[in-house]
Swiss-Prot record:
It is found in: Secreted. Induction: By light and circadian rhythms. Its main location: secreted. It comes from Neurospora crassa (strain ATCC 24698 / 74-OR23-1A / CBS 708.71 / DSM 1257 / FGSC 987). The gene is ccg-4. Residues 1-16 form the signal peptide. One of its GO terms (biological process) is response to pheromone. Keywords: Cleavage on pair of basic residues, Pheromone, Repeat, Secreted, Signal. This is Clock-controlled pheromone ccg-4. One of its GO terms (molecular function) is mating pheromone activity.
Length: 299
């Protein structure tokens, strides 16, 4: 298959217009503090990128017509798209993975499907740029909120009936119907387990998912330790306290804390950076876990 950032995701990112938020810098700074959600997301993104880069080149044998290998490639592409959405430059991160250099090229059948999907996405994108169209209104209202993987409107659009990307998940009814691979090559028929061999696509998909799961679990454990560390004060890392408000001789301690905690409150609001990053982590975890479940009997 051809590795390109899913077109539906690309259109959403391209059409989204950033909306200025009060105290946005303080909120973002809080979210990046060691142990906070944005720090965890960055750690997972780095771990995934390192895992992909360490996989070597193309598989040592032809995978064309082999269904498990094709599914494994789609799984990695799906996980890469989700993680890329959490980055400031979505396309730069996705392109830096160079997935096309790690997995076998598309079969002719996949290329045909990709061309049709691209034409449909481009046609929709052109139509939705016209001021006043229903999709234009929807994008204008939801651009900032709905482009984040895991938001409520993203979940609505990700239903099997509404979102073709859902069909990439192994086992879905639409996956079985649309993505059923052509008849396997004789070599694959004779040895259906070869996709699990070191360097093949199934092995690579499992290793990428393991890297994500390990990074999430490690980050969560480290964050939990920080919460129990009485010497760690994230408030001090956001900015200096206001001496007029936080003079301990004139004001109770909790007044200073409430003032300093405002970036934390904003970050953990329903539309805050910490909340969004937490949803992103859940999305990454769920997809990685699905990949590991699909390859649970592999070495």
């Amino acid at each position: 298959m051809k590795f390109t950032l899913p077109l539906v995701i690309f259109a959403a990112v391209a059409s989204a217009t950033p909306v200025a938020q009060p105290n946005a810098e303080a909120e973002a700074q809080w979210c990046r503090i060691h142990g906070q959600s944005c720090w965890k997301v960055k750690r997972v993104a780095d771990a995934f990128a390192n895992a992909i880069q360490g996989m070597g080149g193309l598989p040592p044998r032809d995978e064309s017509g082999h269904q498990p290998a094709q599914v494994a490639k789609r799984q990695v592409d799906e996980l890469a798209g989700i993680i890329a959405l959490t980055q400031e430059d979505v396309n730069a991160y996705y392109d830096s993975l160079s997935l096309q250099e790690k997995f076998a090229p598309s079969t002719e059948e996949e290329k045909k499907t990709e061309k049709v999907a691209k034409r449909e996405a481009e046609a929709e994108a052109q139509w939705c740029r016209i001021h006043g169209q229903s999709c234009w209104k929807k994008r204008e209202a939801e651009a900032q909120w709905c482009r984040i993987h895991g938001q409520s409107c993203w979940k609505r659009d990700a239903l099997p009936e509404a979102e073709p990307q859902w069909c990439r998940i192994h086992g879905q009814s639409c996956w079985k119907k649309r993505d059923a691979a052509p008849e396997a090559a004789p070599e694959a028929e004779a040895n259906p387990q070869w996709c699990r061999i070191h360097g093949q696509s199934c092995w690579k998909a499992k290793r990428a998912a393991e890297a994500v799961m390990t990074a999430i679990q490690s980050a969560e454990a480290e964050s939990a330790l920080l919460l129990r560390d009485t010497t760690f004060s994230p408030v001090d890392r956001v900015g200096k306290r206001d001496p007029q408000v936080c003079n301990m001789r004139l004001h109770p301690k909790k007044v200073c804390w409430k003032r300093d905690a405002s970036p934390e409150a904003a970050c953990n609001a329903p539309d805050g950076s910490c909340t969004k990053a937490t949803r992103d982590l859940h999305a990454m975890y769920n997809v990685a876990r699905a990949i590991l479940t699909a390859h649970s009997d592999e070495n």
